[in-house]
Amino acid sequence: VKDTVSTLISGMSSSPTAQGTVEKTEKASPSTVVKEKAEAGTVREKWDDVAHFKEALESRVHREKFVPYDKIPDLLKKGIIATEDRRYYDHGAVDIIGVGRAFITNSMAGETLEGGSTIAQQTVKNIFLSNERTMTRKLEELALAVQLERNYSKEEILELYLNTIYFGHGAYGVGEASRVYFGKAPKDLDLSQCAMLAGLPQAPSAYDPISHPQEGAKRMTTVLALMAQEGYITPEEAAKSAMHLWLK
């Protein structure tokens, strides 16, 4: 396992597909933390008004079911950033470099291997929009992501993301995911468990460690390698954590 982690870490900088090799196509049941999504027309009407945008967003989520930002492990936050949006603190609503990297990767592969969506884009999509793949829907996503970045801090956006994203196995948000997979509160997760959860949003069904333990373990190892590459953990910590994972 240690050799596998070392190989992954050394190869990350030359592998543009490492951060997303499975397209996000899963459809899940209605979330307990996100209410029924607003009509597109209603969302459009509220884009340009700061107060109305925040009102529209807050009306779509159940804040009382959120895990507060300071109760979410730093290792999970770092795992999500390393995996989903490694330049999170360096860009606004859209990561032009990330989009360019994804375009080159997908063009070379002849298929969609990597997405260029930022955490802000994923958050507004999950709260407001459908999974429809059209230019109109993408423009809506971009406009909403800009409003999100203008009106919420990076910490607030990450809190929204972690409390509304789908983690598979019927679990929306980090609170449900921690309970479903590990039978504990998020604050009690160890490094390997944080890495496992951080790898799920890319393809929740495919990487579900309960239904697909082998694929889940591979994904966890990849996330640990990404975290080591970004300097969040050491290669030794990545190798050690890759050797164990306890589900509930």
Describe every region a protein language model picked out.
Residues V1-K248:
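Juxtamembrane regions of bacterial inner-membrane/periplasmic proteins
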